[in-house]
């Protein structure tokens, strides 16, 4: 069995292979703890994300499986890449990815961003989204803390745990409130890749202003703040609301006029204002796409249609509609991990995490 080393991080057991050393906490979210470490095989810094109790519920099992499937298949310069994955003897799952020094949230709280950085960061976000959306995938939880940046200003989108195949009947209350598209709040269904463009528009506005554009205290307040800028939703948008209660609520609100963006924003850059306005269209059907946004004049310094690739094929995530028991998700997860390491499921030998040679791994300790 592979050699595992125990460490306590914020009172949480980190049980990793001896391939990784020098663990330091980076951040903690609702579904996992992230540490930085050194990969002794490559001498490179990495990020190790522990998925806590991935098999505690079918919902969490599916979420973890979904994120693994995405990270395995998405290969793009502006999307975080998976370099290793293993399951510890205690059946926690660890994703190992490249380490970037900071995230956009930390940058925005530290200092105002200059125009060239705003342009470059926005360009990279949209470049990544063009690829993801071309595969029929919606991220669903874009926010500054999910946008990683290194010292060279290279940017990568991370945290695909909530991502889904584009589905005209997609449901659920998902993204962080400040960056949540109005169609999610209004209908909870019938939304698509346009929700990511809204979130990116909110991030773009935050880079321009230095603070969140729509800092709602709850979903009602969030919607109210949005209408203070964009005005009352058009009638054809209101008519798409499926919930009768939500429809009555929206129709009961006083009519609000739209505020010109040049009165709301500090920037006097007309190209920036034009692009953010196109990204924050109330109607997702008229919202600009990632591909269209990349070609906008505001991003002309970086736009290169020959270097903005799309996915070779759509992802087949038919499992997303499956209601499976935990044990089935576990078997599927093990299969994906074996496939990631290019090892036949029929074999009992697995590469040692510490270098050349093979060792037999237990059912709960897959690694390389």
UniProtKB/Swiss-Prot annotation:
PTM entry text: Phosphorylated. Dually phosphorylated on Thr-171 and Tyr-173, which activates the enzyme. Rapidly dephosphorylated upon either hypo- or hyperosmotic shock.
Key word Nucleotide-binding present: yes
Name of the protein: Mitogen-activated protein kinase HOG1B
Motif TXY per UniProt: ranges: 171-173
Functional description taken from the UniProt entry: Mitogen-activated protein kinase involved in a signal transduction pathway that is activated by changes in the osmolarity of the extracellular environment. Controls osmotic regulation of transcription of target genes.
GO terms for cellular component: cytoplasm; nucleus
Record CDD domains: STKc_Sty1_Hog1
The record's note on its domains: The TXY motif contains the threonine and tyrosine residues whose phosphorylation activates the MAP kinases.
Main location: cytoplasm
Organism encoding this protein: Wallemia ichthyophaga (strain EXF-994 / CBS 113033)
Phosphotyrosine: residues bearing it: 173
Induction record: By hyperosmotic and hypo-osmotic stress.
